[in-house]
Regions:
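ATP-dependent carboxylate activation and anion-phosphoryl transfer catalytic cores
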Residues: 1, 115-197
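Phosphate-binding site of ATP-dependent enzymes
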Residues: 45-123, 151-155
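Short clusters of hydrophobic/aromatic residues that line enzyme substrate/ligand-binding pockets
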Residues: 38-41, 96, 109, 165
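Active-site nucleotide/adenylate-binding loops and adjacent lid/helix of ATP-dependent enzymes
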Residues: 1-70
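Short beta-strand-to-turn element immediately C-terminal to the catalytic PLP-Schiff-base lysine
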Residues: 10, 38-44, 76-78, 145, ...
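Conserved beta-strand segments that form the floor/walls of ligand-binding pockets within enzyme
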Residues: 3, 26, 62, 75, ...
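Short small-residue beta-strand/loop micro-motif enriched in glycine and branched aliphatics
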Residues: 35, 106-108, 166-171
Length: 197
């Protein structure tokens, strides 16, 4: 099974007025990607959870329990998990700048994890890809709280059905690590693409 953080969907006005979850938690726009607009609400913060004047994303708002620990990601190509990458960065989370600015994050692959956790992350990424009916390539993001025993600290955060494909993006890097060149990856995507209409 796949464990995910507790979460709610609420209106921006409701999130601005009160804590809809106990802090710490993460606020995300429902219609953005690449961590655009993501906010982290800390336990000790006395500020309103959300400033509507600084929230151009509208409704709905996704609010999720913040999971401490290590940031992991897995690319899935067809029905094959590529590898697990641990993302280390100086920001509070893997934000837009860390994702797309060279040198703002370190990608460690394969991630240094206990073997059972490593295999669980791979399996859960493939399970999410299949369960959601994804085709081609996806990338699943996880948090791993290694203070908890075994796989108890592993949480699935989200699946990206259109993961980045820049020179510093994770899926091309993982493919290269397992012996699939960027050219081969792109050719595979074109050759296996199907239209649904």
């Amino acid at each position: 099974s796949i464990r995910s953080p507790e979460g709610v969907v609420a209106g921006a006005a409701e999130v601005a007025a009160r804590h809809v979850l106990a802090p710490p938690y993460v606020i995300k726009p429902a219609t953005e990607g690449s961590s655009v607009g993501v906010r982290l609400v800390h336990e000790a913060s006395n500020a309103p959870p959300l400033d509507l004047a600084d929230w151009p994303f509208g409704d709905p708002v996704l609010v999720e329990e913040y999971i401490p620990g290590r940031e992991l990601t897995v690319g899935v190509m067809g029905d094959r998990a590529l590898t697990v990458t641990e993302i280390r960065h100086s920001h509070g989370f893997f934000d837009y700048d860390a994702k797309y600015t060279k040198g703002h994050a370190v990608h460690e692959l394969p991630a240094p994890l206990p073997p059972a956790v490593f295999e669980a992350v791979l399996d859960q990424a493939v399970l999410a890809h299949r369960t959601l009916g994804c085709a081609g390539v996806s990338r699943s993001d996880f948090r791993y709280d290694d203070s908890r025993p075994g796989t108890d600290g592993l949480y699935f955060l989200e699946i990206n059905t259109q993961p980045g494909f820049t020179p510093v993006s994770l899926v091309p890097e993982q493919a290269e690590h397992v012996g699939i060149s960027f050219r081969e990856l792109c050719a595979w995507l074109v050759e296996t693409a199907t239209c649904h209409g």
